[in-house]
């Protein structure tokens, strides 16, 4: 049997789940316990569902047992119906109606409360995961793709609902039914029932073998589903680039490869699942056949020919024995669901247990002038040194442009200023206070970011501009920000003005329009420090001119740190910091640096692109 199961190949083809491999049974047990703790506070739902299941199963088992008295006492000698037997039959009929009513009530109660329990657990998981994602550090999102994370939030949680609803109701309802049927069999004939005990060890051995197989298959399937989701999300997001560069076939092959692996794992799960029930039924059938041979050989006592097995007890015993196969089959099938849930739960708890963004500060600054001082800053991604000994002094109200080749550390520096990463050495001071001493919320309340890749939300213009502000924002304030960002003219032309939905990431707007909405958002926040990762190189001349005017409006009232790509920005900056290999190699005003004839001069001559 084990060899038969081992033929179902479980080898992973490079897929990896978020949390890594389960290493031992203790870890599996811990996951089970943690999953059960999620329903601990809903014990009354579980109790009511269990009571309903007991009523349901007890009614089913009792109806099967009624075969015994009906056959033994419901008919007279020779199989006819007498007055006495007719009374018994009528009583049995009334009893069956009562049992069916009890069964119906039990079925409703168990399914309703178990279903509600499952939905409550999934609701809680999705809320907890989403809340946790809001607190996770940038390193988490660097390690895991968007598709993988979304798959955990949606697909994995769906697997848990199967364990907390379908699986639990199957275990409770079919489990109590099996117990009830065993009782019926022992009451009908304890001698025959003893033969059924031999099936236990065989079933236990079989189930223990397939448990590990199911768990590995489930883990591989969930991991590959994350890859499928990621590739699909990547394709949808970058559909223009894929078509422009003629990469449809390449991207399709990548998606199909992930899909093929997911399909193969699911087919292996189906094969293993399909193998389980027939084997169990064969074992049970052999036991039943053995019981029939026993009856034929030992069914009568010596001497008077009387039997220890009546027609009624024989019929009720075998009715129960036949009926027990289906719930046993259901119980073995639920193992597939439970193993999927365990694998899914592992990744869910990995996210929930992942260390949150480190909060090192406790101070809060009510008002900030915007003085930013960077002292001997160093940072590395693993073994790769990105910044080394960077020192820059930025006065309040200044516009400082950072220039340098790609990979020189400019963007990383701005991520450290906003504490998405924490420096390994050195310090960054905001108005003389180390940013690590400030709470994350307080520090970021003094910062605005206009990123190179503008990120807008599938919402209205108004909500995108007022995004993140805790106070009520009037339409007049939003319109004022739009005017200062040179965006109000085109917004007025939209179908619903500032209440127009702009689509996924502002897909209904042009590049320049999206840029100006982002600038209007920063204007409304009115933070004393602006981090601007310039992207005007992607715009046409007219859009660039309009955006540049909007930027001038924005930078008048704050300290501006610019990752510069355009000559116009560099020329107008109060200070230019030239970076190379993670170090500051030159610093000064535009004309001063040109006269030095160094790296800045070469970058300037090449257009700074």
Swiss-Prot record:
Transmembrane domains' residue ranges: 47-67, 88-108, 167-187, 190-210, 279-299, 305-325
Reaction(s) the record says it catalyses: ATP + H2O + lipid A-core oligosaccharideSide 1 = ADP + phosphate + lipid A-core oligosaccharideSide 2
Gene Ontology cellular component list: plasma membrane
Chief location: membrane
Keyword Oxidoreductase: no
EC number: 7.5.2.6
Membrane-topology annotation of the record: Multi-pass membrane protein
Gene3D superfamilies: ABC transporter type 1, transmembrane domain (1.20.1560.10), P-loop containing nucleotide triphosphate hydrolases (3.40.50.300)
The entry's keywords: ATP-binding, Cell inner membrane, Cell membrane, Lipid transport, Membrane, Nucleotide-binding, Translocase, Transmembrane, Transmembrane helix, Transport
Domain ABC transmembrane type-1 span(s) in chain numbering: 47-340
Disulfide bonds: none
Annotated ATP binding sites: 404-411
Free-text note on domains in this protein's UniProt record: In MsbA the ATP-binding domain (NBD) and the transmembrane domain (TMD) are fused.
Purpose: Involved in lipopolysaccharide (LPS) biosynthesis. Translocates lipid A-core from the inner to the outer leaflet of the inner membrane. Transmembrane domains (TMD) form a pore in the inner membrane and the ATP-binding domain (NBD) is responsible for energy generation.
Family: Belongs to the ABC transporter superfamily. Lipid exporter (TC 3.A.1.106) family.
Record PANTHER family: ATP-BINDING CASSETTE SUB-FAMILY B (PTHR24221), ATP-DEPENDENT LIPID A-CORE FLIPPASE (PTHR24221:SF632)
Protein's recorded name: ATP-dependent lipid A-core flippase
Organism: Francisella tularensis subsp. tularensis (strain FSC 198)
Native organism taxonomy: Bacteria, Pseudomonadati, Pseudomonadota, Gammaproteobacteria, Thiotrichales
């Amino acid at each position: 049997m084990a060899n038969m199961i081992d033929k179902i190949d479980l080898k992973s083809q490079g897929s990896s789940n978020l949390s890594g491999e389960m290493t031992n049974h203790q870890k599996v047990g811990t996951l089970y316990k943690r999953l059960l703790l999620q329903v601990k506070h809903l014990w009354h739902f579980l109790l009511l569902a269990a009571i309903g299941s007991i009523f349901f199963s007890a009614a089913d088992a009792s109806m099967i047992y009624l075969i015994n008295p009906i056959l033994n006492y419901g008919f007279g000698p020779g199989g006819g119906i007498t007055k006495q037997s007719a009374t018994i039959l009528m009583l049995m009929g009334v009893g069956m109606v009562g049992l069916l009513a009890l069964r119906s009530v039990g079925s409703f109660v168990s399914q309703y409360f178990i279903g509600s329990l499952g939905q409550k657990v999934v609701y809680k998981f999705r809320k907890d995961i989403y809340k946790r994602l809001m607190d996770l550090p940038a390193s988490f999102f660097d390690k895991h793709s968007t598709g993988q994370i979304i798959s955990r939030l949606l697909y994995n949680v769906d697997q848990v609902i199967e364990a907390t609803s379908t699986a639990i109701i199957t275990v409770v309802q079919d489990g109590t039914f099996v117990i009830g049927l065993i009782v019926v069999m022992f009451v009908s004939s304890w001698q025959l029932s003893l033969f059924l005990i031999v099936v236990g060890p065989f079933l236990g051995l079989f189930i223990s073998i397939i448990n590990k197989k199911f768990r590995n298959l489930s883990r591989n399937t969930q991991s590959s589903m994350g890859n499928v989701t990621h590739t699909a999300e990547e394709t949808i997001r970058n559909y223009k680039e894929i078509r422009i560069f003629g990469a449809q076939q390449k991207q399709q092959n990548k998606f199909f490869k992930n899909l093929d692996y997911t399909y193969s794992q699911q087919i292996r799960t189906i094969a293993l699942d399909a193998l389980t029930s027939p084997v169990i039924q064969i074992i049970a059938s052999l036991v039943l056949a053995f019981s029939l041979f026993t009856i034929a050989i030992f069914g009568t006592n010596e001497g008077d020919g009387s039997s220890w097995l009546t027609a009624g007890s024989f019929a009720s015993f075998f009715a129960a024995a036949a009926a027990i196969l289906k719930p046993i089959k259901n119980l073995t099938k639920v193992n597939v669901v439970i193993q999927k849930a365990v694998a899914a739960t592992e990744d869910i708890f990995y996210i929930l247990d992942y260390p949150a963004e480190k909060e090192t500060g406790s101070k809060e600054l009510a008002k900030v002038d915007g003085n930013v001082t960077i002292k001997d800053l160093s940072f590395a991604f693993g073994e790769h040194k990105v910044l080394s000994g960077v020192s820059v002094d930025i006065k309040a109200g200044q516009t400082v442009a950072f220039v340098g080749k790609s990979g020189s550390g400019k963007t990383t520096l701005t991520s450290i200023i906003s504490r998405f990463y924490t420096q390994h050495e050195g310090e960054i001071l905001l108005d003389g206070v180390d940013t690590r001493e400030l709470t994350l919320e307080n520090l970021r309340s003094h910062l605005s970011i206009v990123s190179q890749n503008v990120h807008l939300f599938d919402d209205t213009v108004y909500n995108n501009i007022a995004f993140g502000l805790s106070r009520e924002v009037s339409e007049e304030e939003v319109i004022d920000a739009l005017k200062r960002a040179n965006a109000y003219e085109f917004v007025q032309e939209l179908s619903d003005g500032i209440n127009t939905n702009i689509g996924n990431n502002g897909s209904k707007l042009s590049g320049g329009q999206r840029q100006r909405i982002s600038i209007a958002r920063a204007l409304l926040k009115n933070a004393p420090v602006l981090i601007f990762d310039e992207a005007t190189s992607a715009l046409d001349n007219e859009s660039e001119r309009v955006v540049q005017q909007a930027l001038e409006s924005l930078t008048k009232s704050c300290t501006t740190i610019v990752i510069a790509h355009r000559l116009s920005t560099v020329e107008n900056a109060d200070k230019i910091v030239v970076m190379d290999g993670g170090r500051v190699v030159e610093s000064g005003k535009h004309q001063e640096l040109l006269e030095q004839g160094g790296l800045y001069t070469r970058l300037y001559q090449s257009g700074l692109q």
